[in-house]
Amino acid sequence: KKRTDYMWMSIFDRMVEGKLDGLFAWGMNPACSGPNANKSRGAMEKLKWLGNVNLFDNETGSFWRGPGKDPTQIATEVFFLPCCTSIEKEGSIANSGRWMQWRYAGPDRYGETKPDGDIMVEMMLAIRKLYKEQDGVFPEPILGLGIDKWMEGHEFSPANTAKVMNGYFLRDVTIGGKLYK
């Protein structure tokens, strides 16, 4: 059986073929950053919905009013979810250069922007609510996901999420003469 891959070009091929209903463009701009911008924009026309999570409106969020487009002929519903800049939120980042950093929040976030993690938690809570109310298909992965471990109170916690991903001690442990709490 052929496996489905999730590489950039394969995802957009499936969009062109009408095999994907939606896409979240999270902090990226596929309308102009892929190998074929016209194909990417045409693929987005075939989606039912597009979530553009970014600092500002960009070519992806506004693909429907791009060159040669007739907005009345494009049915894709676009949702703009404004997120914070990297200096306004705490958390880790990684890139294709294979380096990682932990950043602490600097200035207060601007306006109604939110950290990516807060957006993800709000979406997951809303999806869970729908699954419970509407008897969603295959509910175990959705309802069983331990998002409470991602949170501190009612907000997303990058530190707690890092612990979930990397592991942590449940009690004080000394290894090689170093105490871990």
Set out the residue ranges of the language-model regions:
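Non-catalytic, alpha-helical, charged scaffold/linker segments
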Residues: 146, 173-175, 179-181
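Non-catalytic alpha/beta scaffold blocks inside enzyme catalytic domains
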Residues: 1-166, 171
